[in-house]
């Protein structure tokens, strides 16, 4: 999961070795067309009609949700505050975690790699004594907040640091974490 700023960066990267993936091992991936097929479904739903199609699609989405969640957890096991971020905001949060830990503040990060399926499993590893989650993203109101609340079953306070026109600042992330720990930050 990325954003325009990550897409325009010019630093060197190391890519993993190319690997062939057998897409046929998943029943929810694209299947190759047979000769004469055009891939267009005509005349309603095949087989048993819409109920069977809806059940098939429900099972397909469930399998994808289970198998395709992607994230990276950084220092969440003992964190008092855990940032949740993606794209350039996650890079800022990595720096904030480093700075906070140097100051003795237990800050962690869940870096989203996929937005859908939302990586709900990542939140299971959070310290149960965590004081709150800090959504850090370049948006007006925090598009991740509802997903974070759903992933935690609203059992953990969620706070936000949102910036629309500038890259978030690591020092502000640390300051916000300090306010959350002190109990002086307002939930979103």
Segment roles from a protein language model:
Residues 14-18, 95-106, 124-128, 149-154:
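Short, solvent-exposed amphipathic alpha-helical segments in soluble enzyme
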Residues 1-73:
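Conformationally flexible catalytic loops at phosphate/diphosphate-handling active centers
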Residues 1-21, 132, 138, 175-188:
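Structural signature of the thiamine diphosphate
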Residues 5-6, 86-92, 116, 139-143, ...:
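Gly/Ser/Thr-rich loops at beta-strand to alpha-helix junctions
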Residues 137-188:
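Peripheral docking tails and interdomain loops at the edges
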Residues 70-106, 110, 116-122:
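Redox- and metal-dependent alpha/beta enzyme cores, enriched for Fe-S-associated oxidoreductases
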Residues 7-15, 95, 122, 145-148, ...:
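Short acidic, glycine/serine/threonine-rich loops at helix termini
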């Amino acid at each position: 999961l990325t954003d325009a700023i990550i897409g325009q960066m010019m630093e060197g990267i190391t890519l993993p070795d190319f690997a062939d993936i057998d897409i046929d091992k998943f029943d929810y991936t694209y299947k190759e067309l047979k000769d004469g097929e055009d891939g267009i479904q005509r005349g309603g739903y095949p087989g048993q009609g819409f109920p069977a199609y809806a059940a098939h699609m429900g099972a397909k989405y469930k399998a994808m949700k289970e198998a395709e969640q992607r994230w990276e957890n950084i220092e969440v096991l003992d964190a008092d505050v855990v940032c949740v971020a993606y794209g350039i905001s996650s890079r800022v949060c990595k720096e904030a975690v480093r700075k906070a830990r140097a100051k003795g503040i237990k800050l962690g990060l869940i870096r989203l790699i996929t937005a859908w399926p939302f990586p709900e499993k990542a939140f299971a590893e959070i310290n149960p004594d965590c004081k709150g989650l800090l959504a850090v993203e370049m948006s007006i109101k925090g598009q991740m907040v509802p997903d974070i609340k759903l992933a935690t079953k609203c059992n953990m306070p969620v706070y936000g640091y949102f910036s629309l026109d500038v890259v978030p600042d690591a020092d502000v992330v640390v300051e916000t974490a300090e306010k959350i720990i002190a109990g002086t930050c307002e939930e979103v």
